[in-house]
Design a protein with these regions (language model features):
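Thioredoxin-like thiol-disulfide oxidoreductase module
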Residues: 2-21
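A short, hydrophobic beta-strand/beta-hairpin element that forms part of a small beta-sheet core
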Residues: 25-31
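Non-catalytic, surface beta->alpha helical segment in thiol-disulfide oxidoreductase systems
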Residues: 33-51
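Local sequence-structure signature of Cys/Sec-based thiol-disulfide redox active-site neighborhoods
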Residues: 76-93
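Conserved helix-turn-beta segment immediately C-terminal to the redox Cys motif
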Residues: 99-110
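A short acidic, helix-capping loop that chelates divalent metal ions and anchors anionic groups
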Residues: 118-123
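Short, structured active-site "lid" loops
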Residues: 128-144
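Conserved small/polar residues in nucleotide/adenosyl-binding loops
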Residues: 167-174
């Protein structure tokens, strides 16, 4: 029994590695990775576009149902802490949406920039970097923030940009986006 479990795990790990992926709970279809259950809607959309949906219903089986309340009335500001990295494609696709949230809701935006992973000496395998870029691009297309060119401000450019925060922030701990 134990050897069968080990065999199944080894086979799954091999398939995952062959797909150039780095952790479990992902879905893979036709050379496209989906990074967990919050990406199932993309897979369903793709299968529907291909005409593979068996049900005549137009209802989604895996809808992404994240909805903000129509009215959020509060005398108190809600703290939202945002951790952007200058090298992250997720920062590119989220920054404008974060600012819109701040505009539309009683939010006290606290921006806490983080150094890019590469500047923190983190090893990033090529397949992980490729996945992050492709996932962020897919997410960006969904929200009309198409990624065209990629700029990677590692090292001195990042340090200079982050140093400006000392002059633009109301306090050393908080910063504006």
């Amino acid at each position: 029994r134990q050897s069968k479990v080990s065999e199944v795990l080894s086979e799954g790990n091999k398939i995952r590695n062959d797909c150039d992926y780095y952790f479990g709970s992902a879905f893979y279809y036709e050379k496209e990775l989906y990074w967990g259950v919050d990406r199932l809607n993309y897979l369903e959309d793709r299968l529907t576009e291909l005409g593979a949906k068996k049900s005549p219903s137009n209802e989604s089986l895996a809808p992404l149902s994240i909805k903000a309340p129509e009215i959020l009335d509060s005398d108190k500001l809600i703290n939202l802490t945002y951790y952007p990295s200058l090298n992250s494609p997720y920062t590119f696709i989220s920054a404008k949406r974060i600012k819109q949230l701040e505009k539309d809701y009683p939010i006290n935006l606290i921006t806490r920039p983080v150094l890019p992973m590469l500047m923190r000496m983190m090893a990033i395998p090529t397949f992980k970097a490729k996945y992050i870029i492709s996932d962020a691009a897919r997410e960006g297309r969904k929200y009309d923030y198409e990624m065209k060119e990629i700029f990677s401000p590692i090292g001195k450019p990042a340090r200079k940009a982050y140093s400006c925060l000392l002059y633009t922030s109301p306090s050393p701990r908080d910063s504006t986006l």
